[in-house]
């Protein structure tokens, strides 16, 4: 079973992402911020990381940069799931190493389609 790490400081977003992806057949682990996400990623192997941008302690860009320095996460797809839609933010995400970007609010079908595309 493919494993996904969902990192978001919003419990309702984590619940929606987890519910949607579990129903699509994925195993989902959840983290409350970038630091928590990094700790969980270092202790395990995920096939996809989905992260919010704006979070306390460590934001999504810092998390992506830290993950990309980990040998096991050099090529793992990382998806930004955020309310931010400005071109500058997307550019910063790409420079940090993000694979893709979904703007909130999002549909369950959209999230599943992107996950299937990113996880081979």
PLM segments and residue spans:
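Receiver (REC) domain active-site loop signature in two-component systems and cognate sites
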Residues: 55
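Short hydrophobic/Thr-rich beta-strand motif most characteristic of the beta2 strand and flanking loop
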Residues: 25-32, 40
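C-terminal output helix
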Residues: 106-115
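Active-site residues of response regulator receiver
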Residues: 52, 82
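Active-site beta3 strand of CheY-like receiver
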Residues: 44-50
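Charged docking surfaces used in two-component/phosphorelay signaling
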Residues: 15-23
